[in-house]
Amino acid sequence: MPSALILYLNYFIHGIGCSILGQAVIKEALAASWGVEAMAITAISAALGLGRLIALPFAGPLSDKLGRRISTAIGSGSYAIYLIGLALAFNAGTNGGYTIAYVCAIIGGIANSFLDTGIYPAVAEIIYKAPSVATMGIKFFIAIAQMILPFVLGATVATTATGLVSYNMLFYICGVIYVVLLVLVMLFPLPDADQKAAGKKEGLIDSLKHTHFSIESVAMILIGFTCTGTFQLWLNCAQNFAKENVGWADPSIMQTYYSAGTLIALVVTALLTRKIKDVRFIVAYPVICLATLIVVLAGQSKPLMIAGAFIIGWAGAGGLLQLATSVCNMLFPKIKGTITALVMIASSLCNYTILTAAAKMQPSQVMVMNIVLTAVGVALGLFVNVRYGVLLKNAEEA
C-alpha cells in the first residue's frame, strides 16, 4: 500500500499542475510578466494537450516494455521540469518567458501520458481485488487537489521586487515534490505483470490496418473530442468569463465548486451505473452541460457561475470520458483496444486544438464555442443511443 500511496500522490500534484493555468489569477500574473493578454495563457494549457498527443503512441508500449517504475519515473521527472520551468519562465519575463513556458508545457503533457500508462495499470495490479476502486482513487486524489487549489494559491502568492504578483513558490514546491516522488518511485516496489506480455501486444498502427470502423464507432471517437472540450473550455476559460462579463474580481473559488462536483459525481455516477446503462449518460450528461452553459451565458451572475462550476464539474468532468470508453468496450468488443486508444487521442487532440483556438477569443466567444461543441456532443450521444439496441445485438453475436 505505501507504493500505491506514492503513485496516488503523483496524481494529487498532477491535479494542481493540470488546472493551475486555468486559474484567472495565475493567468494574470503570467500575462503581466510576459507582456501578453490573459487569454493568451490558454495556449500554454493547449501545449499540455499537444505534449500528451505526442507521447500517446509510444508511452504505452514503452510502459509495457520497460515497466511501470520507469514509465512513472519518466512522468514524475518530466512533470518536475514542467512546473519548475513555469517559475523560470515567469522570471524570464519578456525575454522568451512565453516560449519557455510553452516548451515546458509540452513536456508536462508528455509527463501526463507516462503517468497514465505507468500508474493506471500499476494501481490496478496493486489493488487487484478492486481495480475499479483503484482507478477511482486516482480521480479522487486529482479532485481533492483541485478543490483546495484556490486556498493554496492564497497561501503561496507573493510580490516581486518589481511589483509583479508571483506564484513561483507554488511552482517550485510542486516541482520539488515531484523530484521526491521520483526518488520514492525508484525505491519502492512496483508491479510489472504486463511487462512479460509486451512482445505479444499489437501496436495501434498495426491494428488500424485491418480494423473496420462503423459510423457508430466514429461517433464514439468524436464523443471523446466533444466531452473533453466541454470541461476543458470551462476549466481554462470560465474564470476569465466571470471576471470580464460578470465583474467578479477573484473567481478562483469556482475551482473548488467545480472539483466538488467532480468528486461527488465519481461516487454517485458509480452508483447510478448499477441501475442505468452507461450509454444513457453519454447523452444525459452533455444535455445537462448544454443547458447549464446556455443559462450561464444568458444570466451572467455570481450565483450562476458557482452553480455552473459545480454542474460542469459533475456532468462534464465527473467521469463522462471514462463512461464513453466503457461504452466503446461494450459495443465494439473486437476493436475495443483500438477504439479506446482513438477516443483518448481525440481527447488529447481536443485539448490542443480547442484551447489553441480559445486563446485567440474573448471569454464570451469561448462560452459560445463551448455551447456549440457540447450541442454536437448531444447529437452524437443521441445517435449512439438510438442505435444502441442494434449495436448491442451485433456485439453479442460477434
Q: Regions from the language model: what does each represent?
A:
Residues 129-130, 134-190:
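Helix-loop-helix hairpin linking two adjacent transmembrane segments in secondary transporters
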Residues 55-68, 265-278:
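Helix-to-loop junctions at the C-terminal end of transmembrane segments
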Residues 22-23, 212-263:
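Extracytoplasmic gate region of multi-pass secondary transporters
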Residues 77-95, 288-300:
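C-terminal ends and interior cores of transmembrane alpha-helices
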Residues 104-140:
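Cytoplasmic helix-loop-helix junction between adjacent transmembrane helices
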Residues 114-127, 318-332:
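Intracellular juxtamembrane helix-capping segments at the cytosolic ends
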